[in-house]
Amino acid sequence: MGDNKGRSTPRVVCCAIPIWRPAGKVLLVTSRKRKDIWVLPKGGWEPSDGVLEAAASREALEEAGVRGTITRFVTTIPSASSTYHFYELDVADLEPDWLESKERKREWVDYAEALKRIGWKSELAQALALSSIAPKR
């Protein structure tokens, strides 16, 4: 049996990979729980979201203050407690003040730096490696 943290089924988590294509950068945010670690904007799907893409877009706005267009489904990665769904978000607008701006920092970084910073969380690193911003093999 997996660790579902008291849930009967794994939590559905929707993640955005915010990309600024002209610069080839990805936007990371700090965790609210641990200010020294970096993550991709992500959070639980809510029934009011409707589709998973809407949840990923909402989380990007709440956690990172970015608006844009979901352009690509990247992957789904199951873990013991959650099922992660990753989407690329082409950023169109960066809000100067956003819902979690007092709780998080955000920073544009290149692919290699992003991979280094989120490598502690295998699901995030795997998804970034499958994104269109990853170097072609």
Task: Indicate where each model-derived feature is located.
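A short coil-to-beta-strand element that immediately follows conserved catalytic motifs
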Residues: 65-77
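Active-site-adjacent beta-strand/loop module that shapes the phosphate/pyrophosphate-binding cleft
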Residues: 75-113, 124, 128-134
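A residue-level structural signature of the nucleotidyltransferase/glycosyltransferase Rossmann-like core
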Residues: 9-11, 37, 106-107
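Conserved N-terminal beta-strand and adjoining loop/helix that marks the start
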Residues: 1-26
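Conserved Nudix-box catalytic region and its N-terminal flanking loop in Nudix hydrolases
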Residues: 22-66
